[in-house]
UniProtKB/Swiss-Prot annotation:
Its EC number is 2.1.1.n7. The active site is at residue 279. Gene3D superfamilies: Vaccinia Virus protein VP39, Winged helix-like DNA-binding domain superfamily/Winged helix DNA-binding domain. Keywords: Methyltransferase, S-adenosyl-L-methionine, Transferase. PANTHER family: O-METHYLTRANSFERASE (PTHR11746). GO terms for molecular function: 5-n-alk(en)ylresorcinol O-methyltransferase activity; O-methyltransferase activity; protein dimerization activity; S-adenosylmethionine-dependent methyltransferase activity. GO terms for biological process: biosynthetic process; methylation. Belongs to the class I-like SAM-binding methyltransferase superfamily. Cation-independent O-methyltransferase family. COMT subfamily. Pfam families: Dimerisation, Methyltransf_2. It comes from the Eukaryota. This is 5-pentadecatrienyl resorcinol O-methyltransferase.
Length: 374
């Protein structure tokens, strides 16, 4: 167990609490989607317990939406609407190999089953009425419509945001100076909060390195904090040209800003920092970013590594508030094409990107530090 000061521990716990309050509306969004897709009815028709694949078949949603359904059900199980049980003979059909989680109705979700199918009076009409604002609000970004949408062969994997608005969040930021400023200010505030704790409690992760490149580092909040703490460290911030154009002109002497694209190339350095970046991208996109990072750093023996600051879902499964916050934030990210990953999901993309070893340190509350080695 890593020991940190009581002040830092309280700040990290307060961060989780605020994040939970901020994104708790995603539980209502998940419930609205469950009602729209008639998930409780689907499980009821399977005898009260069903795997994801079985639910998918019952509700008539395409198999490519299975990961999205998993994320909806993860929120609804953590919040207690459904529960996960051991596979039974009924659920271990030819459709399942016994490794899929099996979702069971609880007393709460049994009240979502339609009255025609259940002896218990259904509350679905009442909840449909109460939750209707979430269907029409940008807060949900048309998640139900996304589940029902047939994938376009010309644009596979389109996220709910793009389906609703016809563009990506990043393109909106590029075109709209006000939204770009709002986003950059939000990321800078997060960096100021997190780096204060990181450099106070865990500064050793930056010891013994000569150069660092902060990939998609925005206006440089994290990098400038690191550079101030380590004046001999040569630091580079890489981001898109329209982002670095808004960087402060009076930056610290050992920090430079470079306009570029992480999907094309990354400036060379001993260490690459990816703070809260990879969760915005699909597995394939993360693998491409990580391969470019690998080309930018030396071997492990020569001090090369990647420092990732991101969520590892289930990093402390004993903390129910933390876990709930991680999964409801993951559902929020799903709307823009992002994803929060558990350790096995992280490991998969690390190996596919050609890395040999990694170390996860769940020491930043909601997020963890991951050191990744070539």
């Amino acid at each position: 167990m890593v020991l940190i000061s009581e002040d830092s521990r309280e700040l990290l716990q307060a961060h989780v609490e605020l994040w939970n309050q901020t994104y708790s509306f995603m539980k209502s969004v998940a419930l609205a989607v469950a009602l729209d897709l008639h998930i409780a009815d689907a499980i009821h028709r399977r005898g009260g317990a069903a795997t994801l694949s079985q639910i998918l078949g019952e509700i008539g949603v395409r198999p490519c939406k299975l990961p999205g359904l998993h994320r909806i059900m993860r929120v609804l199980t953590v919040s207690g609407t459904f529960t996960i049980v051991q596979p039974s003979a009924e659920t271990m059909s030819s459709e399942s190999d016994g490794r899929e989680p099996v979702y069971k109705l609880t007393t709460a979700s049994s009240l979502l089953v339609s009255s025609e199918s259940s002896a218990t009076a259904s509350l679905s009409p009442m909840l449909n009425h109460v939750l209707s604002p979430f269907r029409d609000s940008p807060l949900s970004m048309g998640l139900t419509a996304w589940f029902r949408h047939d994938e376009d062969e010309q644009a596979p994997g389109m996220c709910p945001f793009t389906l609703m608005y016809g563009t990506t969040l990043w393109e909106v930021c590029r075109r709209d100076d006000a939204i770009n400023a709002l986003f950059n200010n939000a990321m800078a505030a997060d960096s100021n909060f997190l780096m204060q704790i990181l450099l106070k409690e865990f500064s050793e992760v930056f010891l013994g390195i000569d150069s660092l490149v902060d990939v998609a580092g925005g206006v440089g909040g994290a990098t400038m904090a690191i550079a101030a703490a380590f004046p001999c460290l040569k630091c580079t911030v890489l981001d898109l040209p329209h982002v670095v154009a808004k960087a402060p002109s009076s930056s610290i002497g050992n920090v430079q800003f470079v306009g570029g694209d992480m999907f094309e190339s990354i400036p060379p350095a001993n260490v690459v920092l990816l703070k809260w970046i990879l969760h915005d991208w699909s597995n394939d996109e993360c693998i491409k970013i990580l391969k470019n990072c690998k080309q930018a750093i030396p071997s492990r023996d020569a001090g090369g590594k990647i420092i990732i600051i991101d969520v590892v879902v289930g990093s402390d499964s004993s903390d129910t508030k933390l876990l709930e916050t991680q999964v409801i934030y993951d559902l929020h990210l799903m709307k823009i094409g992002g994803v929060e990953r558990d350790e096995q999901e992280w490991k998969k993309i690390f190996l596919e990107a050609g890395f040999k070893d990694y170390k996860i340190m769940p020491i930043l509350g909601l997020r963890s530090i991951i050191e990744l080695y070539p």
